[in-house]
Amino acid sequence: MRKVLLTGFEPFGGESINPSLELVKQMASRALPQVEIIGCEVPVVRYQAIETVLQAVETHQPDLVLMIGQASGRCAITPERVAINLDDYRIEDNAGHQPVDEPIIATGPAAYFSTLPVKAITHALQQAGIPCQISHSAGTFVCNHLFYGVQHHLHTRAIRSGFIHIPLLPEQASASNQPSMSLETLVHGLEMMMITCLETEQDTKHTGGTIC
C-alpha cells in the first residue's frame, strides 16, 4: 500500500472557498487500488504552511506529496516545474504578513525543481482531454513559498513531491468572468496525476518549454 499526501489551501483573498481544498476533500474520501490518500488543509500563512505540510509528512511518511493551489486566470491544470527562493507578496497572507523581496530560506539555493514527472502528467491529462500544461512560475505568494519550503526539506529524501495549480471553480469564476474547471474534471485529473506519478519512474522526454 502506497501513501499519497494531498495538500490544499484554506480560502484567501476574500474568497469563501478554495478549489484546492475542495478537491482534496473530495479525493480523501475516494479509493484507489493499493493507494492510501491522506488529505491536509494548509493555512495561507507564511512559514505555517511549510510547517503544516512537513508535520504531515513526518506523521504519515508518504511516498508522494502533491501540493495543490488555486490559480485565478488559468484555464488549465498546471504542474509547476520550479520553485524559487523568493517571497514577494502582492497581498497579505491570512495572518497579515506581506514580505517584499525576502528569501524563503536565507541559506537555501535560488530554486528547486519539482520531482514529479511533470511532462508525463501533462501528456496523460491532455490525452484524456483535460486541459493541462507545464507552468514555469508558481508566483511569489504562499503557493511558491510552500513549494520551495517542502522541496528544500525533501530534496535529499526518497519522497516525490511537487506543486499543481488548478483553475477556479465555476461558482467562483462566474462573477468575474474568469476561466474555470468543474470539480468533477479536477477529480478525474488528480486521479490520473496520482497514478502517473506512482507508475512513472523517469519522466518522458519531449518539449514542454515556452518561448517567453
From Swiss-Prot:
GO process terms (BP): proteolysis
EC number: 3.4.19.3
Compartmental location: Cytoplasm
Enzyme class: hydrolase
Keywords: Cytoplasm, Hydrolase, Protease, Thiol protease
MF terms in GO: pyroglutamyl-peptidase activity
Active site: E80, C143, H165
Pfam families the UniProt entry points to: Peptidase_C15
HAMAP family given in the database record: Pyrrolid_peptidase
Family: Belongs to the peptidase C15 family.
Protein known as: Pyrrolidone-carboxylate peptidase
Native organism: Vibrio vulnificus (strain YJ016)
